Every structure is written in C-alpha cells, then in structure tokens.
Amino acid sequence: MKKLSKRMKALSTKIEDRTYAPLEALGIVKENANAKFDETIEAHIRLGIDPKYTDQQLRTTVALPNGTGQSIKIAVITSGENVAKAKSAGADLFGEEDLVESINKGNMDFDLLIATPDMMPKVAKLGRVLGPRGLMPNPKAGTVTGDIASAIKEFKAGKLEFRADKAGIVHVRFGKASFTENALFENLKTLQESIDKNKPSGAKGKYWRSFYLTSTMGPSVQVDINALQDYQPES
C-alpha cells in the first residue's frame, strides 16, 4: 500500500469522515490546494451503472459556465476547404490523410480530436491508437461534426467531454484552485445537472453512489449530492 506523505497526512486530519455541503467542500479543497502551482480541482463520481451494457453507458459533453482554466490542444481531421477553416478557427493541428497517417504512427500531441463526417471511415482505422486514450471522435461528444469552427470555439472556451469508466466512475477536471468558490460551484452545479440529464436508460437502483472533490495534490472531500441537487439560486 502506498504511504501518504507527511503533507497529505496533515491535510487529511483536517477533514472529517462525513459528507460536506458543496460550498463547504469547495472551501476545504481550495484551502488545501497550497502547492507551488495552480492546482486543478477535480470531481470523482461513482455512479450506479455498469458500462459493459450499452444502455448503462454515460458519455456526453458539458459547457462549464466559467471554463476549466486549462488550455487544450485540438486536432482536426477534415478535407478540402474545411482544412483552412480549422486553421482559422484556432485548431492546433489540422489535416487530411496526412494527419491520419501521422496519428497512426503514434504522433498524439493533442488533447482532443475533431473530425468531419466524411473523414470518419479513415479515422475509424485509428481505433487501435485512439480508443485506449479516449480520443476517438464521437457524434454524442460533439467531436464528429460538420461545423468545425463552432466545435473548436466551444471546446476552447471550456466545453468538455466526460464519460463513465469501466467501473462506472466519472472523473472531471472542472476548474483551478485560483477560481473563486462561487465560480467552482457554478461549474460543479452545471456538471451535476448534465450527469442527471444524461442518466442512462438502463441505470438501476441508486444512481449517485459517491461524490468526492479533490485538488491535484490535496486529499479528497466527500460531497452531499442531495444538497447540490436541491440547490436553488436566490431569486
């Protein structure tokens, strides 16, 4: 078993073994994010689903109102005049068959891959290299589209794709420690609403099993999901 560092042990002793109200949890996570860099704030959510069944899979996108605080590199596989459109829209990598070949050789210097529908037969051949990294374009994720410019703009602005892994756990980076608690809360609330809205049709029993927040170098804090779901902004 991996030993906890002295710093982590010290921080963990400040956290009680209970669920916290969302804003209280965010305050604790921010306070403990005291590394020498701007730590990323993450949500780790275990859902009552078994993704080996197609009707219990969760994969979608969410546009966080305050962005993620992270810059992402976007690659676009398209053809014809769309290549120039991808370049002008801010894509970091763009191309046709040449980019397909480059990726097939293992050149994966990007965080997100967008493709136009006409190129998907060629992109499908990259499943062996893209699949394990979760980079295969998908219509549900908004990464297979004819409107390249809008897709690039949205993802650069903070739209992100998330999915439940094989264990039914969702891992999402939704902000930075430098964000205000309210900005983080708005992002977190938007994420919660997206997960509820996209609940798989085959999900059975209790949907939200556990919900933890943490920072890159900090301990985790359990969140009261009911308090988050029930929150209503003051009118």
Swiss-Prot record:
Which molecular-function annotation in GO is an example for this chain?
rRNA binding
Q: Which InterPro entries match?
A: Ribosom_uL1_bac-type, Ribosomal_uL1, Ribosomal_uL1-like, Ribosomal_uL1/biogenesis, Ribosomal_uL1_3-a/b-sand, Ribosomal_uL1_CS
Provide an example Pfam family for this protein: Ribosomal_L1
Q: Which UniProt keywords apply?
A: Repressor, Ribonucleoprotein, Ribosomal protein, RNA-binding, rRNA-binding, Translation regulation, tRNA-binding
Q: Quick check: keyword DNA-binding in the entry?
A: no
- Can you cite an annotated GO cellular component? large ribosomal subunit
Name any Gene Ontology BP term.
Answer: translation
Stated family: Belongs to the universal ribosomal protein uL1 family.
Task: Summarize the subunit comment.
Answer: Part of the 50S ribosomal subunit.
The job of this chain, per UniProt, is described as: Binds directly to 23S rRNA. The L1 stalk is quite mobile in the ribosome, and is involved in E site tRNA release. Protein L1 is also a translational repressor protein, it controls the translation of the L11 operon by binding to its mRNA.
Task: Output this protein's name.
Answer: Large ribosomal subunit protein uL1
